[in-house]
Amino acid sequence: MRLLIAIALALAVAAPGVAARPATAPVTTHHRAIVGGRAIDYDATFDEQVLSDAAGKPQATISGTAYVRTGIVDRSKRAVTFAFNGGPGASSSPLHFSAFGPRLVERWGSGEAPSIRDNPQSLIDITDLVFIDPVGTGFSRVLKGGSGQPYWDVDGDAKAVLGFIRAWLKRNGRTGSPVYIAGESYGGTRLAEMVGDADDLNLAGLIFISPALGNEGEGSDLDYVFALPSMAVAAVRNGKAGAGGRSVDAVFEDARSFAMGDYALALMKGSLLPDAERDRIAARMSALIGLPARTIVEHHLRVDAETFRKALRSSEGLVVGRLDTRVTAPVPKHEPNRPSAANDPALGLGASNVIISDAIGAYMRNELKVPIDRPYVSLTLDVNFKWTWPQSRGGAAPSLTANIAKAMAAKPRLRLLLVGGYYDLAVPLLAPRYALDHAWLPMDRVEMIALETGHSAFEGEQGRLEMKSLMRTFIKE
């Protein structure tokens, strides 16, 4: 689950021996947006920080953009929401410019003219917003003679994010404000890691969006159990399995019941599974996920996401998206040194390892008056490939749900919102649900929502409408 696109926050202030000082001086501009049919005035502030090592040598920069509504009499009671995606190697651009932020950037590719408009579903009317890009993404960068490696691992990254949040709250006189933190994809790992050390924050809500919450199923039969319901809805959507008049939710739930019942029991038997039972399970799987029973048997009933998305529409010369199984594209040319997930048609990476957004760069320079000429990096696999994973876990993302349980036990009013998409095979919907179900959380303060979307759960106009409704309720409860 390493290549999970999304968004990030960071600033290494809390890490021992790490100091931060301004690079580009903070820039504040004043704006008005129409949100929910009302005019909302707000200040936008871009801030870049230099991260230094224990000896004081500058290593890299972290940058963030804050949107603060003006005209508020008592800011101590107004919520502030910090949002980040993941990757690792993803900027905050998806949540910033496609979901929560006051402006939408609707064209992303290099060479395209900016297409920017107000976001009528922005959260700026109900909460102040802070979007931060980690080292190597957005306008953030590794400095000459420095290194991003201290911030390109689970622990260093989380310390950097938590340090940024503390510094921002203190600098802006908001330590008493209700704090909400939203992490998407690997951002869920980041959020779960850092809340274990966030007792000093006035945390009100944790928002996990298509989160990678750890390695509960990684390398085990649980991987296949988690993926099967998402494969079932993908097969129906792609015309390879029948819905029988059922809703997406009903298709998912029927497949979930089978996956966690007969299917899981069959996998547990391993090579001791009788042939007759194997064939019965394979036939049921075939009806659910649209692959031939023979193919399923050849894989010992264990069909992973990559096998599924390549096989589902192979007769048409198409591969199905990983981040969004509703998206298809012609089978790409085989590149032995390139991860299959990098060729995901729902990712839009093309032959490069980097997505540059000219539109976002132009917005930052022209509207927010940011005096930076370098490109805005929306996503870079170069950071992803350099990420250091805990070797004690075989190079996998750690399981961090105990941190969430600890935080919720320490803060009796802290609530959690989990949002996922039915069409997400990068983080199948069942995986984070299972992780939270087994974290011994106070479930009366936990809400789990499934949307008819892919990995970017709030993408598109309908996604933003659903997002605004969910977030308005969650933040104001």
Annotated model-derived regions:
Residues 25-71:
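N-terminal cap/lid segment of alpha/beta-hydrolase-fold proteins
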Residues 5-14:
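Bacterial N-terminal signal peptides
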Residues 56-150:
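N-terminal cap/lid subdomain of alpha/beta-hydrolase-fold enzymes
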Residues 105-106, 195, 199-289:
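A catalytic-pocket lid/entrance helix-loop region that shapes and gates access to the active site
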Residues 209-210, 216-226, 291-476:
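C-terminal subdomain of alpha/beta-hydrolase-fold enzymes, centered on the catalytic histidine
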Residues 124, 134, 151-169:
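Alpha/beta-hydrolase active-site loop
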